[in-house]
Structures are given as C-alpha cells and as structure tokens.
Amino acid sequence: MINSPLNYTGNKFKLLKQIMPILSNQSDTMIDVFCGSGLVSLNSDCENIVLNDNNPVTISLLKYFKNTPSDTIITNMEKIISDYGFTDSNKNGLHYYKEEKHEGLSRYNKEPFNNLKQDYNKEPTIEKLFALIIYGFNHYIRFNSKGLYNVPVGKVDYSTSLRSKTKEYAESFQKKKIEITNYDFRDERLYQNKDAIYYFDPPYLITQAPYNATWKESDDKDLLDLLDRLNKKGIKFALSNVVNSNGKTNKALIEWSKKYNVFYLDRKYLNSNYRKKNITIAEEVLITNYKEVEYGNEWK
C-alpha cells in the first residue's frame, strides 16, 4: 500500500483494506473531490485520477510530488537538514541522540525548526514547507489567520521510514494519469465525467479537528444535495464520513444515508492531542449509491 509523508486529518491509510474493495472495479477514472494527500485514489485501481482540493497549499504540495523526482525531493530535504542543523536519525541512528521521555527529538530540533519557520514565513518555498511539515508537531499543516505557518516543533525527524514514504509516494504519481485541480466541491466543472466514480472525504461536521472548524451544517447540506443530484444522473459516488463521535450524532447524515448503501468501518482513533490521553471511538462509514461490491474481499 502506498502511504504518504503528509499527515492530513482523517488520513484513510488504516482503512484502505476496508475501503478499496468497495471502490474497486467501478470505473477507470476516479475524481477525488476532497483529496488531501490523495491516498485513496492513488491506491485505487483507476488509471485516471483527478486530485481536487480547495486548499491552495495542498495543491502546491501535490504538484511538488507530481512534478519533482523523488530523489530530488529527498536531496532538497537533506540540504535543509544540513543547513539548519536538524537531527538526522537516518544518517546517525537514533542512538546518537538522547531522547527525552515524551519529548522525543524536539529539544534538538526546536531552534532549527523555529529558524526555518521564520525564514519560511518571510520567504515561502515548497521545499521549506515540506521540511516544516516533517519536523512539525504530528506533521500538521496549519496556518494562522495572517497566513503564517504556526505549528510547533515535533518529536521525530526525517527518518528512514519517512524517506521511504517520500520515495514511494512521489513515484506513485508517475504510475497513473493524474490531473490536479483547485475547485470548491460545489463547482460544476468537477462533475462533467458521467462515467467516473466520485470519492468524497469532506471535513466531518461532528468531529473536533481544527481542519473541520470551518465546515458548517450548510456545507453538509450542500454536499448531500449534490450527491442526490449525482445519483439522479446515474453517476457513481462514495462518501466517507462519521455518524457518531464523542457523544455527538450527525442525525441528518444518518437519515439521508437510508436511501443508499452504508458500510461501517472499523477504526479506533488514538487522540494525539497532548491534553487528552484516551482512545475515542468514532463510527466511520462509507456510503455508496451502487451495490456492485464484493465487500470483505482481500485487498493488498
């Protein structure tokens, strides 16, 4: 399975073995409307993919991986690591550094990270941004209201594992015909291919991740109405969402879903918020308007 060095909230990597059998053999084209890192579509059996997101930063990152050889991406990262003095466990081994309990490598990387963050906010480049994501807390991609990157330093560095993910992820862009677009999900330009399967993984109305903060009930309604219109046109769709989370229920989604096919997915969310040490159960679903699936089949 292809994984990504980019950590987007709601990343579907752990659910791919459950999701992909439902999406497989539906079309040779997938339109990934809220693509994030694009893991679902990149792992699909579709030869043609449209990666769409309304976030211009996401689009810039996707284009970087699509248009830059993997070795160049890694070399660019190595130069930043050297120039700023970040830890390099791939080169030196973790034993070279004395990790503090609960802090990992953060004490070594705090000053280099803050220097890089300052330089990026003055003169942004995609190479600097990728380094900030790797060395930032939980690999978050977050900006404040002034457009400045404002994630604190993280606990890990550009490890051997992350280098492998970088290489695999970048090379996956060369194995399919990929178009990258930057439209709002309501934009009709996205829905011109009646033979494609459309995959939606929007922000979740009832979860508390910062990514979901700007998503309102009106957005949820607009999306569900759009899906109904696609269904009337005979266009296949699959929607990832959450129906219950931390005592909250998306009643409108549950009622709407009764018209379609609902697959319940098994995932336990390990809450990474340092203020909460618990594992929370979110009832995540995949909703489709087609039935031609062999659910539960082995998928690799």
Model feature map: region roles:
Residues 150-156, 204-222:
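Mobile active-site "lid"/loop adjacent to the S-adenosyl-L-methionine
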